[in-house]
A protein has these predicted regions:
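Non-catalytic protein-protein interaction segments used by genome-maintenance enzymes to assemble
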Residues: 11-79, 101
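Phenylalanine-focused residue identity feature
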Residues: 2, 59-60, 87
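Bacterial replisome coupling helices
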Residues: 77-174
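Non-catalytic, well-ordered alpha-helical scaffold segments
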Residues: 3, 33-41, 62-70, 118, ...
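Charge-patterned, long linear interaction tracts outside catalytic cores
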Residues: 1-15
Length: 174
């Protein structure tokens, strides 16, 4: 009887197929997202970075990042200071809790340097200006009026100058 059970189990064992675990596709973040995550992480750690964000960048075009930034600014205005641990306690009741934790988890090296936040801000500006530049160039192709084309052309030139200044500043640092 033991041998019969043993043989039965072996035959059942051969029928069982290993089910591979579901593939977890890890999405890579683009330069804008990485920069935004770092800026927000810096802001969660010290109000001086909140001030730098407000004066040097002002807003994020992406709603998710803009809402988290506004939440941090609100927290600083209410509490007159910010520390990561206290902000995380506050975030527990925030509707943005998941976004806030996702940002914190994305930071690989949590070193905070003032020069780095400026690099991240410049990345954001450059990307936003490049997107604006594409939009203006597409608009310019559709416009018939010479005066309108000229106005848009000036905006394009101004944006190109701003982008080149940021790229030049970055290449000097490297």
């Amino acid at each position: 009887s033991y041998d019969v059970l043993k043989n039965e189990l072996k035959s059942e064992e051969s029928k069982i197929e290993a089910i591979p675990p579901p593939a977890q596709k890890k999405e890579r973040k683009n330069r804008y997202e990485v920069s935004a995550d770092h800026i927000l992480y810096y802001m969660m750690n010290d109000q001086k970075y909140v001030k730098i964000y407000q004066t040097k960048l002002g807003f994020f075009k992406e709603e998710k990042y803009r809402k988290v930034a506004n939440e941090i600014i609100y927290y600083v205005e209410e509490n007159k200071k910010i520390e990561l641990a206290d902000f995380l306690t506050y975030a527990e009741i925030s509707p943005l809790k998941n976004e806030i934790y996702e940002i914190i988890k994305s930071i690989k090296v949590p070193n905070i340097e003032e020069t780095s936040i400026m690099d991240y801000i410049n990345n954001i500006k450059e990307i936003m200006w490049e997107n604006e530049l594409k939009k203006y160039k597409n608009e310019q192709k559709k416009i018939q009026d010479i005066n309108e084309k000229e106005k848009l052309g000036q905006k394009i030139v101004d944006l190109m100058i701003k982008i080149q200044e940021i790229k030049k500043e970055r290449s000097v640092k490297e």
